[in-house]
Amino acid sequence: MDSLEARLQFIQVLKNLQKTLHKTRDSITSSSTTTPPSSQQKLNNDPIQFYLRNYRHHYEDFHQCLFDTTMKMDPLDRLDVVIYYVRIIRNLYPHSHSNTNVTKVLNEVLLMDIDLVFELCLPCQDWKSLTNQATCKELFLDLSKLIHYDATSVTHTPSDTTLIDATTWYSVKTERTTKDYKESLQRTESLLKDRDLKKLAFFQQFNSDTTAINPDLQTQPTNANILLHRMEADRELHKRSKETSWYIERPSNDILDESEFKSLWTHFETTDSGFDKDDYKNIKALNDIAKASYIY
């Protein structure tokens, strides 16, 4: 796949994130077992797997394409891109300690521009984009926990009595004087704290006794199709989270982790003398129930 083809395919991946971005955690290492055809089809359509399969040769193309394509979206539609971006980092980070190529892509590309990605979702002077604030905070805190970055200040909720300047919006672009991913994380932290204050300022006007609305806090009308698209995206995200709430993260795609199996095996060896007749009867009963469920 050449550079042009990679860009074209990645644009389609970004445009279809609402339909294809599942709430799963895919490992960069494949299982030793054979993947069933149905599962293979899902992996082929998975946007995270697409990135993991092709990023070694095209990560620069993908990165530039992500910003160019996302800039053309409405801010309400950009949340899926941030979710996608963070999940890519989550999949790559466990391998960064043993693979220098992964470390380079993470530290010099993905984490380096994490602040710009979040600002795409929370742009300056766009009040409706504050709808993305809560999810962005969750994503950043989740990412900070993964890479061991202290982001406790983001969890602090500003007081209702705080005096807020609604006219000045923090922008990470004016602060990008050095190239260091740790400073990029700090700028993202500052961005989220500023947007928390802007969100508070927006709601404070409805709690005040003044009848006049501050012109700096007025929002522009939003296209109905954009609102409906965002509502559908939120519904789909909620649906996916419910469908996979039972999911247990494994170090690999194997059914049972080796350490987990040993722990269970040792537990039964030390607390139970072994199987008795009742155990075998229970197993037979469960087997009969399982067979009966496949009669048709």
UniProtKB/Swiss-Prot annotation:
This is CTD kinase subunit gamma. GO terms for biological process: DNA damage response; mRNA 3'-end processing; positive regulation of DNA-templated transcription, elongation; positive regulation of transcription by RNA polymerase I; positive regulation of transcription by RNA polymerase II; positive regulation of translational fidelity. Belongs to the CTK3 family. Keywords: Cytoplasm, DNA damage, mRNA processing, Nucleus, Phosphoprotein, Transcription, Ubl conjugation. Pfam families: CTK3_C. GO terms for molecular function: cyclin-dependent protein serine/threonine kinase regulator activity. Disruption phenotype: Null mutants are viable, but grow more slowly than wild-type cells at 30 degrees Celsius. They are cold-sensitive, failing to grow at 12 degrees Celsius. They display flocculent growth in liquid media and they show abnormal cell morphologies, for example, a significant fraction of the cells are greatly enlarged. Deletion mutant is sensitive to the DNA synthesis inhibitor hydroxyurea (HU) and UV irradiation. CTDK-I consists of three subunits, CTK1, CTK2 and CTK3 (also called alpha, beta and gamma). Interacts with CTK1. Heterodimerization with CTK2 is required to protect this subunit from degradation. Residues 29-39 have a biased composition (Low complexity). Ubiquitinated. Ubiquitination leads to degradation by the 26S proteasome pathway. Gamma subunit of the CTDK-I complex, which hyperphosphorylates the C-terminal heptapeptide repeat domain (CTD) of the largest RNA polymerase II subunit. CTDK-I phosphorylates 'Ser-5' if the CTD substrate is not phosphorylated at 'Ser-5', but will phosphorylate 'Ser-2' of a CTD substrate if 'Ser-5' is already phosphorylated. CTDK-I is also more reactive toward substrates that are prephosphorylated at 'Ser-2' or 'Ser-5' compared with an unphosphorylated CTD substrate, therefore efficiently creating doubly phosphorylated CTD repeats. GO terms for cellular component: carboxy-terminal domain protein kinase complex; CTDK-1 complex; cytoplasm; nucleolus; nucleoplasm. Its main location: nucleus. Transmembrane segments: none annotated. The modification Phosphothreonine is found at residue 35. Present with 2640 molecules/cell in log phase SD medium. Residues 25-44 are annotated as: Disordered. The keyword DNA damage applies. It is found in: Nucleus, Nucleolus; Cytoplasm.
